[in-house]
A protein has these predicted regions:
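Hydrophobic alpha-helical
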Residues: 180-211, 226-227
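Glycine/small-residue-rich loop that forms an oxyanion/phosphate-binding "nest" at active or ligand-binding sites
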Residues: 71-114
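Short, acidic/small-residue loops that bind anionic groups at enzyme active sites
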Residues: 101-124, 211-230
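N-terminal glycine-rich anion-binding loop in soluble enzyme alpha/beta folds
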Residues: 2-71, 138-175
């Protein structure tokens, strides 16, 4: 005989902060790196995926606009979020930060929406950064669009370099050692305030401390600034002190 047992309902998982993250279908890195930061038991992090192209072009990036509300709508309907992050740097430069926020809010309940571009601008303001060295994996057209958006936000792209890789599956597998070598060549003898590693598919967390020590300047990445900005908007602080000066000091 089956017994009907009593139960009680508690609060939503994550007593202090509730985060949502929209990850590109082609992204293999963002969730892996976020798991290293959003690991406090008092926080919850829910993820959704948005359809994206295998190749990074202005056209494939623009197409994501059509699917963002649907991706946000795949979060639990009853959940209320402090912050939802959209995980695409170049996509933000093409679609626009305000448009992204509007589309995400149509699909879920959240107090704040952010993405790597707004997060980078906020991080640079917090750190007093104006002159950026910019390392990109993208083809020229995509990189130029993003650089123009950053210049319009008051940042000076002092020096720029790119791997010029169009396939997302290859971007996700660029080795950290390749990034260290490229960063050192790019920043050498340049008068910059910080280095920015652009793209949520780049593996950046493991090399931030090493690069800051060798370059003697702050090192920011798409995943790093997005994580920091999401925590900041929620009124939270990171517990990590081994991922660069942004998380450690701000």
């Amino acid at each position: 005989m089956e017994q009907k047992l009593s139960f009680e309902l508690g609060a939503q998982v994550g007593a202090d902060a509730h985060f949502g993250l929209i990850v590109l279908q082609s992204d293999q890195t963002l969730e892996y790196e976020f798991a290293q930061v959003f690991s406090k038991p008092e926080w919850s992090l829910h993820t959704s995926r948005v359809k994206s192209g295998d190749e990074v072009t202005v056209e494939t990036l623009a197409e994501m606009e059509n699917d963002l509300t649907g991706a946000a709508g795949l979060f639990p309907k009853s959940a209320r979020y402090d912050v939802v992050g959209y995980g695409c740097t170049s996509g933000t430069s093409v679609i626009g930060a305000k448009r992204i926020a509007d589309l995400v809010r149509l699909g879920c309940h959240t107090t704040h929406v952010t993405e790597p571009v707004s997060a980078l601008v906020a991080a640079c303001k917090a750190m007093g950064v104006k002159r950026l060295a910019f390392l990109s994996p993208y083809i020229g057209e995509v990189s130029q669009t993003l650089r123009q958006v950053l210049v319009e936000q008051g940042l000076d792209i002092t020096v720029f370099g790119s791997f010029q890789e169009q396939l997302e599956e290859n971007v996700a597998r660029i080795t950290p050692s390749s990034m260290v070598s490229a960063s050192q060549k790019l920043v050498s003898k340049q008068n910059v305030d910080a280095l920015f590693l652009s793209c949520t598919n780049l593996q950046s967390f493991s090399i931030v401390e090493e690069l800051e020590q060798s370059l003697q300047c702050p090192v920011l990445s798409s995943n790093l600034v997005l994580a920091w900005h999401m925590m900041t908007l929620a009124g939270m602080c990171s517990h990590r002190t081994d991922m660069g000066s942004l998380l450690r000091e701000h």
